[in-house]
Every structure is written in structure tokens, then in C-alpha cells.
Amino acid sequence: MMLSKKNSETLENFSEKLEVEGRSLWQDARRRFMHNRAAVASFIVLFLIALFVTVAPMLSQFTYFDTDWGMMSSAPDMASGHYFGTDSSGRDLLVRVAIGGRISLMVGIAAALVAVIVGTLYGSLSGYLGGKIDSVMMRLLEILNSFPFMFFVILLVTFFGQNILLIFVAIGMVSWLDMARIVRGQTLSLKRKEFIEAAQVGGVSTASIVIRHIVPNVLGVVVVYASLLVPSMILFESFLSFLGLGTQEPLSSWGALLSDGANSMEVSPWLLLFPAGFLVVTLFCFNFIGDGLRDALDPKDR
């Protein structure tokens, strides 16, 4: 009897160890994301780039506005401390690439935040309310989407001048449009679910249903699209700056540095290679992370 009792206790302990704990959606997504080597490696590289643009100007012996008149358009040199070289005005390129990276990343992340907040609320309300309200809201979206964006930017620059705030306004105006469409499509399928109908029967207000029930259930799609939107907005800001419609002196961004480097590419190729390298690597990292999040959060792959 003693032996059988010990055996039963051993079996119970062993079965408890073998018991598989249930995982939530986000725990399962994190596990799947960590198994994606390209996404994890991209996340690490992106973290290092963010660390570089934050810390490098603080550790450098040169400031953003310092000019070395004796080393104008100088090639990268370890002895002088100009590790990325200097531009035509003798300013340290490493510091300028780091400061420009701050602005480019800030624009991309800010555009993604605008898309997440405005696009999610607009799309979820449109999809949930349905009927004529949905039709009107979608027609308004189509009008905004068909508006020539470059013409809009030129008008802003003409009337208000060039500054970084206009870049945020201009890019924020278009970043949320596709997000609203995606969230609306998800909401149309969600509002027929039993838990939404139960909330309606229980007298829960429309605002509470949207914020407490619909928005949390579309966050997976929102996170994936936001991660893929950041590189698009960084590239768009770089394009505007390259055309001279974006950030201007004394501020700079990777796009503005590319524009300066392209003008002197034959005699000073480092002015183009360093900002272009950081821009390309950052865009690839965001895209790999977005692909990893999409694979991790896609319910079809479960």
C-alpha cells in the first residue's frame, strides 16, 4: 500500500510537470516572433541604430554646428576624429548622420502613431455604425485619398514656409487613410460576433463597444500595418527632403543628406554612402520586423 501510494504521488507530480499551460494570443505571437531569425536580428540591428542616433552626438568631440575649416570635404579619418569624414562646410558627417537619423525615425514613428490612433478609431467607427454613416465616411476617405499629395505639400510650403512641423502635418494627413480601410474591414466581420451582440443587448454604448471590444481585437492587424508603415513614411520624408520640400538647414535628415551627397558623389562619395547605408539598413529592418509580426499574429498560420 505504501508503495502504491508513493507511485500515485509520483505519477501526479509527473503529470503536473507535463501539463501544458494555455498561452494567450500575445504570448503565442511572441514565441512565434522569437523563432523568426530575420525578424529578431533586424530588431537587434534597429536597436543599435536607435542607440547610435541617440548616443553618438553626445559622445562625439564635435557638435552639430562645428566647422573644421582645415578639413572641408575630408575623407573618413580615424586620426582626426572625423570617422565618417566631413561635408563641404567642414562639419562632422557622423554627427550629422546621427542627428538626421533622429528626425527621420521621429517622422516615421510619429506618422505610424497618427495612423494607429486616427485610422483605428475612424475605421472601427465606420465599420461598426454601418449604413449611410459608413458610406459617407468612406466617400470622405476616398476624396482625401484621391487628393494630389505633392500639390498639397507645395501649397503648405508656399503659404507657411519650410519647417519640420509641416512635414509632420503633411505626412500625418495621409498616413492613416489605409489604416482606416483595413480596420473597417476587420470591424465589419467582428461586429457580427456573439460577444458584440451580447454587449448590444446589454445596453453598452457605441463608444464603449468600439473602444473596449472592437479596438483590442484588431490590434494584431494594426501592429503589423504600423510596423510596415514606418519605413514607408521614412522613405517618403527622405523623398520630400531630397526634392528640397522637407527638412532644411540648420536641421537635416537622411533624405536631406542624400540630396547633398548626390551633388558631390563623384568627388566625395562618403557623403552619399553613409546616410544611404543607414537609410537602407533601417528600411530593411523595419520590413523584416513587419513580416515577422505578420507571421506571428496571422491566425491562418496557427
Each language-model region and where it sits:
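Transmembrane alpha-helical segments of polytopic membrane transport and secretion proteins
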Residues: 1-44, 289-302
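Proline-centered turn/helix-capping motifs that create local helix->coil transitions or kinks
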Residues: 2, 59-63, 232-235
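Hydrophobic alpha-helical transmembrane segments of membrane transport/permease proteins
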Residues: 8-13, 52-88, 243-251
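Short, membrane-interfacial amphipathic segments enriched in basic
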Residues: 11-29, 79-92, 129, 207-208
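Membrane-interface helix starts
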Residues: 30, 34-47, 105-109, 266-273
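Residue-level signature of catalytic and energy-coupling elements of molecular machines
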Residues: 33, 51, 143
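Short, strongly hydrophobic transmembrane alpha-helices
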Residues: 38-57, 120, 280
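Alpha-helical transmembrane segments of integral membrane proteins
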Residues: 88-302
